[in-house]
Design a protein with these regions (language model features):
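Amphipathic repeat-derived elements
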Residues: 5, 11, 18, 152-161
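Structural motif
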Residues: 11-13, 25, 101
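Local cysteine-cluster metal-coordination motifs and their immediate loop/turn environment
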Residues: 17-32
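N-terminal [4Fe-4S]-dependent radical SAM core
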Residues: 1-14, 62-63
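Conserved non-cysteine loop/helix-boundary elements of the Radical SAM core domain that shape
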Residues: 32-168
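Short linear sequence motifs
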Residues: 13, 20-23, 37, 95
Length: 169
């Protein structure tokens, strides 16, 4: 009965989860882990790509159209540049695009690089979310975020100037 209410003709939204972060924020309630040198990201990415492949196959078999794609986390930008490009290009290839809207959660300033922003933009993402949480240094410290308000502002400036993002959150 629940699936009877889904408007398949207008498409569906695809969520790609990267459940890893550089550190764990004290307020976080998400099912995510800290990426360390011992984290087997190759195994996670292989499993994620298999999940993407199977999901895309089902969508094609059922005639479903993708309306939007969102990559969230955790912190998707905890992926290395090559990993980020691999996952995004694979998903776009399997699903044949992203529909009308494509957003990537860029997460934390300590994981964002110009190269990652360029990869995200080159894959077609029109929106990124940098998630400042707060611009108060004391609050950032209390919740376990290791960046500063200036780091947030610098990332926003980089996204606007270097990569020409206009839809920032």
């Amino acid at each position: 009965a629940l699936l009877d209410k889904v408007d398949y003709d207008n498409g569906y939204s695809l969520y790609i989860g990267i459940p890893f972060c550089r550190t764990r924020c004290l307020y976080c309630s998400f099912a995510s882990g800290v990426r360390t040198d011992k984290t087997d990201m190759a195994a996670y990415i292989a499993a994620l790509k298999e999940d993407i492949r199977l999901g895309a196959e089902i969508a094609r078999d059922c005639g479903f159209k993708i309306r939007s794609m969102y990559m969230g986390g955790g912190t998707p930008t905890v992926l290395k540049e090559s990993e980020l490009e691999d996952v995004l290009s694979y998903a776009l290839g399997q699903y044949g695009g992203y529909g009308r809207e494509f957003t990537v959660e860029a997460g934390r300033p300590d994981t964002i690089t110009r190269e990652k922003l360029e990869i995200i933009k080159s894959m077609g993402a029109g929106r990124i979310s940098i998630n400042p949480q707060t611009m108060c240094q004391r609050t950032l410290e209390l919740v376990g975020r290791s960046h500063t308000p200036k780091d947030i502002a610098d990332c926003l400036d980089m996204a606007r100037a270097a990569v020409s993002y206009t839809h920032l959150r």
